[in-house]
Amino acid sequence: PSEFTLHEGVLKHGKMNIDLVYNRLTDFSLSEPASATLREAYLQNAIVLTPNPQAHALFADKRNLVLLSDPIRLQALGVPKATQDILLAAIPHTEIVLPENAERLWQKRRELFFKPFAGFGGRAAYRGDKLTKRVWQEIIAGGYIAQALVIPGSRVISDLEPAQVLKFDLRNYTYDDK
């Protein structure tokens, strides 16, 4: 992104005009200095940015999972019972890692998975039973959620001995309001 320029409302990379950017950076909020030109182009509606900062904040920030997995808060917000049932069945219990819950979470770590608020693709995500004390110190420094561990499913894909088994996971996505 630091190689982009914005000239008269047109984002450019060298001489090439850019009108769509598929954002695979980890700076989804475009707050880092290297993203300044990209941020300005987005704010001027000079480009389509996917995901854009608002979409990322609404749909990808893992802190939202804390609310979406809390039955008391969902009820207090007036979320319909049928919607609550779907959310609570699909989203493992999630909480923010804080200094005041760090000791309890460390004791329960084998039942948890730790993920950064805004990470993606498994970057800096840790299964609790594999944590070292060094990594735990990074996690409790801030910016992580703890989520109930869901063991990945598996399928036998061969009749050979030993059978070949592959793990899989299911993910929830949203696109175009669906």
Model-derived features: positions:
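Domain-scale recognition of functional cores that engage charged ligands
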Residues: 1-178
